[in-house]
Amino acid sequence: MKHGIKKRKLSRCTEHRLSTLKNLSISLINHEQIVTTLPKAKELRPYVEKFITIAKNKNTLHGRRLLLSRLHNSKLAVDKLLNVLASRYQDRKGGYSRIIKFSTRKGDCASMAVIELVDRDIAARGKVYSKNKEGGKVVTQS
């Protein structure tokens, strides 16, 4: 019986699956829209929404350290979460991302999906949030 099985395994061992989800979440936070397979997108959605909730509710040193430990020490993604996304979603109580079904992949006919952040900045498409040498935050072309 399959009682209590809630997560998808994605044909990966635990370490590889968690690493895949962390890397996908960093990409989604940086670019605010990514194209991936539908099962990965469905598994990624609650994972990223928990990060946004932590950034929104715990905008302290403890929250920063929690996010750094869960996002492969990606300081740029954590800075964007705490400075940009937390203020953007301050009035929203949940549902920070949406999944739009896409076509199938040509090679293996896998169902593809676009996962994006709601109310994303469309003008920032293809740009990455980064720091300059003086410590200020800038948006650069990727």
From Swiss-Prot:
One of its GO terms (biological process) is translation. Keywords: Ribonucleoprotein, Ribosomal protein. InterPro entries: Ribosomal_bL17 (IPR000456), Ribosomal_bL17_sf (IPR036373). One of its GO terms (molecular function) is structural constituent of ribosome. The keyword Metal-binding does not apply. It comes from the Bacteria. Pfam families: Ribosomal_L17. SUPFAM superfamilies: Prokaryotic ribosomal protein L17 (SSF64263). GO terms for cellular component: cytosolic large ribosomal subunit. HAMAP family: Ribosomal_bL17. Part of the 50S ribosomal subunit. Contacts protein L32. NCBIfam families: L17. Belongs to the bacterial ribosomal protein bL17 family. This is Large ribosomal subunit protein bL17.
